[in-house]
Amino acid sequence: MKYVRCVLLTGALFNIAAGLKCADSKVLSRYKVSQHAAKGKFTESTPPSETTDFWWINLCEEHSEPVPDKCKDDAMFCHRQQVKLDDGKEYVTQVFDVPRNQEVDVEELRDGFQVSFTGKWGERERKVKVRYTCADDKAEDEVSAEGAFGAHTTPVEVALRGPSGCIQATEKSSGIGGWITWLVIYAVLLTLIYLLAKSYMSVGHGSMQDFREEFVERSTNLVSSLPEFAKEVMGKVVGGGPSSRGGYSAV
């Protein structure tokens, strides 16, 4: 069963259980996160070896993408650490993945949003925080991790910068255009209510046929007068109306 729990923080905080369908989230549905999966790779020299961390996150169940090697099939988040020795041999030393049935907290921020969840790594529970920010000039999300994964007492903090943290195009376009649309809708509704009320008052206790004829006549008169009204308004706006000048004119 899915549910949403709201808490007042910097933004709105939502708790979502079961597989995360982003379209059902009030916050996540506004962003492009359901269209992308993020992955990152970081290599560090750790003599006598070389250590590489692989990060992968596919937050929304709407987006389908193969899970990386060594990660569980039902993972929505996975971190894999791999060590390459100086003889060229490679070993996977750590795998930490979080299944889709984990609860996910979503917090909307001023410059994006943050998700947090908890997964089990061996006998320990690890808290993960992933922060999304928008970079609409990038085709894929860039992943960076803050702090060492081996610090078991601190949360795993991952930062994603890319298209996933950007608001949907329909959300951006709603502004002045949206207000104009609503104003037109309200104007039409108020006009319709006015015509119905005036028609009803005119016929009094007359028949339904009388009311319909009165309503049609008033509506027709209103529609036929609109072009002349619009022409008069445009004339006032463009021409500024007739100007008067005092004094005598030369003959």
Curated annotation (Swiss-Prot):
Lumenal side: 20-175
Membrane topology designation: Single-pass type I membrane protein; Single-pass membrane protein
A GO cellular-component term linked to this record: vacuolar membrane
Classification via Pfam families: ATG27
Keywords assigned: Autophagy, Cytoplasmic vesicle, Disulfide bond, Golgi apparatus, Membrane, Mitochondrion, Protein transport, Signal, Transmembrane, Transmembrane helix, Transport
GO BP terms, alphabetized: cytoplasm to vacuole targeting by the Cvt pathway; pexophagy; protein localization to phagophore assembly site; vesicle organization
Domain MRH: 20-168
PROSITE patterns given in the database record: MRH
Disulfide bonds: C22-C60, C71-C78, C134-C166
Intracellular or extracellular location(s): Cytoplasmic vesicle membrane; Golgi apparatus membrane; Mitochondrion membrane; Preautophagosomal structure membrane
GO molecular function, one term: phosphatidylinositol-3-phosphate binding
Residue intervals on the Cytoplasmic side: 197-251
Primary localisation category: membrane
InterPro entries from the UniProt entry: Autophagy-rel_prot_27, MRH_dom
Transmembrane segments: 176-196
Signal peptide start-end: 1-19
Signal among keywords: yes
Family label: Belongs to the ATG27 family.
Record function comment: Effector of VPS34 phosphatidylinositol 3-phosphate kinase signaling. Regulates the cytoplasm to vacuole transport (Cvt) vesicle formation. Plays a role in ATG protein retrieval from the pre-autophagosomal structure (PAS) and is especially required for autophagy-dependent cycling of ATG9.
Protein name per the record: Autophagy-related protein 27
Species this chain originates from: Eremothecium gossypii (strain ATCC 10895 / CBS 109.51 / FGSC 9923 / NRRL Y-1056) (Yeast)
